[in-house]
Regions:
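Short amphipathic helical patch at the helix-1/turn junction of helix-turn-helix
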Residues: 6, 17-18, 46
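DNA major-groove recognition helix of helix-turn-helix/homeodomain DNA-binding modules
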Residues: 50-65
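Short, charged recognition helix plus adjacent turn
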Residues: 68-90
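Recognition helix of helix-turn-helix/homeodomain-like DNA-binding domains
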Residues: 30-46
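Short basic helix-loop element that most often maps to the first helix and adjoining turn
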Residues: 10-29
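Conserved hydrophobic/aromatic packing and binding residues within compact polymer-binding modules
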Residues: 12, 26-27, 37-40, 66
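Helix-turn-helix DNA-binding elements, focusing on the entry/boundary residues of the two helices
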Residues: 12, 23, 34, 49-52
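A detector for short, charged/polar N-terminal pre-domain segments
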Residues: 1-7, 75
Length: 90
């Protein structure tokens, strides 16, 4: 089984490519360095939850897209934490 960081990184790279963005462009949109984005995409670094939310909003995808169904308990714990998060109505 592949590491969850690698899977998430591949999904981010896929989204970036399908939307015609360079690492420099997406890194700027996410507020991270180009090097950090590259580390996320390669699965070297764990992605911060705030960056996950930005990716979801930028590409209009669900967390299930980034964290696909796997047998990994870590994935299930991440997904369950999002179930109870809803946007605040101001």
């Amino acid at each position: 089984m592949k590491d969850i960081n690698f899977i998430v990184g591949q999904n981010i790279r896929d989204l970036r490519h399908r939307n015609g963005l360079t690492t420099k462009m997406l890194a700027k949109m996410l507020g991270v360095s180009q090097q950090q984005l590259s580390r996320y995409e390669r699965g070297v670094n764990k992605i911060d939850v705030s960056v996950v939310f930005k990716i979801i909003n930028i590409f209009h995808v669900s967390y299930e897209y980034l964290f696909p169904e796997t047998e990994n308990d870590y994935t299930e714990s991440i997904k369950s934490s999002f179930v109870y998060m809803e946007p605040l109505a101001i």
